[in-house]
């Protein structure tokens, strides 16, 4: 990813943290690995 994506991800971190436990991605190990910012 580039710097612009990182900045956007930083701004979204709080919202992601609130929704992570309900995100269906987080019950999929492959998705979790590719989206650590969502599922941590």
From Swiss-Prot:
Family annotation (PROSITE patterns): ALPHA_CONOTOXIN (PS60014)
GO cellular component, one term: host cell postsynaptic membrane
Top-level taxon of origin: Eukaryota
Residues covered by region (Ser-Xaa-Pro motif, crucial for potent interaction with nAChR): 27-29
MF (Gene Ontology): acetylcholine receptor inhibitor activity; ion channel regulator activity; toxin activity
Residues that bear Cysteine amide: 39
Pfam families on file: Toxin_8 (PF07365)
Keywords recorded for this protein, A-Z: Acetylcholine receptor inhibiting toxin, Amidation, Disulfide bond, Ion channel impairing toxin, Neurotoxin, Postsynaptic neurotoxin, Secreted, Signal, Toxin
Any Gene Ontology biological process: negative regulation of signaling receptor activity
Annotated tissue distribution: Expressed by the venom duct.
Localization per record: Secreted
Function in brief: Alpha-conotoxins bind to the nicotinic acetylcholine receptors (nAChR) and inhibit them. This toxin blocks mammalian nAChRs (alpha-6 or -3/beta-2 or -3 > alpha-3/beta-2 > alpha-3/beta-4) when heterologously expressed in Xenopus oocytes. Does not block the muscle nor the major neuronal nAChR alpha-4/beta-2. Discriminates between nAChRs containing alpha-6 and alpha-3 subunits, being selective for alpha-6.
Free-text note on domains in this protein's UniProt record: The cysteine framework is I (CC-C-C). Alpha4/7 pattern.
Family of the protein in this entry: Belongs to the conotoxin A superfamily.
Protein name according to UniProt: Alpha-conotoxin PIA
Organism, as annotated: Conus purpurascens
């Amino acid at each position: 990813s580039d710097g612009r994506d990182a900045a956007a991800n930083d701004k979204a971190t709080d919202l992601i943290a609130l929704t992570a436990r309900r995100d269906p991605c987080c019950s999929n190990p492959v998705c979790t690995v590719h989206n650590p910012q969502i599922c941590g």
